[in-house]
Amino acid sequence: MTQLQSLRGMVDLLPEQTRCWQAVESVARDHFRRAGLQEIRTPLLEVTELFARGIGEATDVVGKEMYTFVDRGDRSCTLRPEGTASVVRAALQHGLLSQGPQRLWYGGPMFRYERPQAGRQRQFYQIGVEYLGVGSPRSDAEVIALAWALLVDLGVQGLVLEINSLGTLQDRQKYREELVAWLEARSDQLDDDSRKRLYTNPLRILDSKNPAISELLQDAPTLFEALSVESKARFEEVQVDLEALQIPFQLNPRLVRGLDYYGHTAFEITSDQLGAQATVCGGGRYDGLVEQLGGAPTPAFGWAFGMERLMLLLESAASINPNGSAARLTASTRPDLYVVNRGEQAERVALVIAHQLRAAGLVVELDSSGSAFNKQFKRAGRSRATWALVIGDDEAERGEARLKYLQEATTQANPIPIDQLHRLDDVTGLVRLVRE
């Protein structure tokens, strides 16, 4: 019988990887808590119209990449390709915006039918932040600073913050006309992809990965030149606030985001450690999205980072600096104690002891194999536990267990009284019992 495999681009996270992800998520949760954010969780499956209206029908995401099907109720449904539209839909549906500004964060899997490669899968995980109902330029800088501080705290190397202003809808319409006219005069130099986008989504040509197109665009008019006086002044305020926060940034007049709802400030944080997939975090202002989805005009700003790319960066950083924060985050979680036991009476005693020590807060791995002691000790070594608690029928009869330090092969196992183990709340207590 053929062995079943996961779908292409749908990757399993094995226990060691999951522990690393949990460590990163814990750091993110702490940053969000200190910034006063609240978590929101939305369904994986939404009506297709949400993304068609929110993201834009002319985008690659809606046109090429979504997982869409018609369900048994004859409704067109889509696995969410990003998180922002779902968060805004939930805020509208449940009246959150009537309660004042909302500072929300989310995390979970998204789905896009793309060509899988390192750091980019068809099921991918994002952690994102959405500030709804907050419209000042200062809030742009605040939310960007939250992303920057988190990535720095995680130990990511080679970070570069790029910012741009996409202006208002009127600014973009004016620029679109100028850009289309400029590109039409050079249509013979465009590749097939750029020709397709010329009249549907010309701003996306600015983000072309074709080196020839990138070189051609060096002489193209920039969006900044088309911005109104008000849009330029607003963008200047964002830059002043980032400077006040001592966050280095670069202006990138070619920076556009792949979703139609962005306007005014847009940003990306890249790393020189990622190669072609350099962007680790991106976002911006999307003041028109709430209204597009049926709500009142509401300012909003948000960002998201992809966990897969972030983990690639942390693994790279850990290899560069084995003592840094990234190395600590990507290290496997070690059990405090591995319980080695054999014999009918010993196994029951070991079960009770493991339960008591876990309740006291220790990380305890119990060997339930019933195999020979030497095999159990080999497994204890592979677990990377610091200590082994050894119980045989003889020890159980005497009311003792033996504690062995696993980091030195020659260390003797020292007896400790079983009836004292319930007092323990950390491994230091184990060592203290041995000395007593």
UniProtKB/Swiss-Prot annotation:
GO MF assignments: ATP binding; histidine-tRNA ligase activity
Entry EC no(s): 6.1.1.21
Chief location: cytoplasm
Gene3D superfamilies (UniProt xref): Anticodon-binding domain, Bira Bifunctional Protein, Domain 2
One Pfam family in the UniProt entry: tRNA-synt_His
Cellular-component GO terms for this entry: cytoplasm
GO terms of biological process kind: histidyl-tRNA aminoacylation
Chemical reaction(s) catalysed: tRNA(His) + L-histidine + ATP = L-histidyl-tRNA(His) + AMP + diphosphate + H(+)
Cellular compartment(s): Cytoplasm
Keywords attached to this entry: Aminoacyl-tRNA synthetase, ATP-binding, Cytoplasm, Ligase, Nucleotide-binding, Protein biosynthesis
InterPro entries named in the record: aa-tRNA-synth_II, aa-tRNA-synth_II/BPL/LPL, Anticodon-bd, Anticodon-bd_dom_sf, His-tRNA-ligase, HisRS-like_core, HisRS/HisZ, HisRS_anticodon
Keyword Iron-sulfur on entry: no
PROSITE patterns in UniProt: AA_TRNA_LIGASE_II
Keyword Transferase annotated: no
Quaternary structure annotation from Swiss-Prot or TrEMBL: Homodimer.
NCBIfam families in UniProt: hisS
Stated family: Belongs to the class-II aminoacyl-tRNA synthetase family.
Protein name (Swiss-Prot/TrEMBL): Histidine--tRNA ligase
Organism whose genome encodes this protein: Prochlorococcus marinus (strain MIT 9303)
